[in-house]
């Protein structure tokens, strides 16, 4: 049996080369991946949180893992509905949270590791959300090296996780994951529904917030938008090679140099501070890049 590291490394290499992967479902028969998933989930605070059953991390065993694998071999795995709770947001509103049972959570983590290994090398370098070793800090680091940027557009996709179209998501996955059994397993998971106040409700769209696999699925879905921006929109609207310099900035630079030659360091420093407040290039220039 191959180690989890070996399996994920092979998948990662396929992802780097943007080559399709096959027989993904068979990877779910590898016990090492479940032990890897268990080690990942066990330290989390939510490990003891119950779903719609009393099953928690303490009830996991090698025997249960083997039984889960056997059920998967028979293609009889049944996802259980998530238990829905609501948590308060900073703005006072409430956000729905879907809590899966422990067995489903472990299987989701195995699937997440496979998907992450394959898709992570293909994601945009300008994407920072829900990604390993990335976040607000890396986004800020990228912004710091931008030049001539005066405008930022802040946007929010309302209820993004809840509105992801299942059909489109599955079509995106099926492009490069040539394994009908694995795609069906994902589809069944998306349609497992949830219990709210012990009443079953169907899920016709979205991925559950609180699901281990949900962030990677959301990123795979939104990566289509990133690709469109970088491959279609940027080439279409990017003109010229560089922006024209800002006359006001150049004027201050010349004045600073003059003052330094005259020995007036104090006034020169004041102008340096003032110059920092304006861009060095003309942000209204037609050569201005739409996206950097």
What is the role of each PLM region?
Residues 1-290:
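Non-catalytic terminal/accessory segments
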């Amino acid at each position: 049996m191959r180690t989890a590291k070996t399996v994920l490394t092979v998948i990662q290499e396929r992802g780097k080369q943007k080559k399709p992967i096959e027989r993904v479902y068979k990877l779910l028969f590898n016990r090492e991946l479940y032990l890897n998933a268990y080690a990942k989930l066990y330290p989390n605070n939510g490990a003891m949180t119950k779903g719609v059953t009393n099953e928690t991390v303490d009830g996991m065993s090698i025997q249960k893992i083997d039984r889960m694998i056997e059920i998967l071999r028979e293609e009889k795995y049944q996802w259980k509905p998530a238990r829905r709770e609501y948590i308060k947001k900073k703005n006072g509103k409430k956000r729905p949270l879907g809590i899966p049972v422990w067995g489903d959570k472990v299987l989701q983590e195995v699937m997440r590791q496979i998907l992450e290994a394959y898709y992570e090398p293909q994601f945009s370098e300008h994407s920072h959300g829900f990604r390993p070793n990335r976040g607000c800090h890396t986004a800020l680091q990228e912004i710091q090296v931008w030049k001539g940027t005066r405008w930022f557009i802040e946007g929010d996709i309302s209820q993004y996780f809840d509105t992801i179209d299942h059909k489109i998501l599955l079509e995106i996955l099926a492009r490069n994951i040539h394994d009908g059994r694995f795609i069906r397993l994902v589809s069944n998971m998306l349609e497992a529904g949830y219990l709210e106040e012990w009443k079953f409700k169907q899920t016709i769209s979205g991925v559950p917030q609180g699901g281990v696999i949900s962030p990677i699925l959301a990123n795979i879905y939104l990566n289509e938008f990133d690709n469109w921006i970088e491959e279609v929109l940027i080439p279409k609207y990017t003109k010229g090679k560089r922006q024209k310099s800002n006359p006001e900035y150049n004027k201050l630079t010349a004045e600073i140099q003059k003052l330094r030659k005259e020995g007036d360091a104090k006034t020169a420093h004041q102008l340096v501070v003032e110059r920092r407040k304006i861009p060095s290039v003309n942000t209204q220039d037609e050569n201005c890049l739409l996206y950097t």
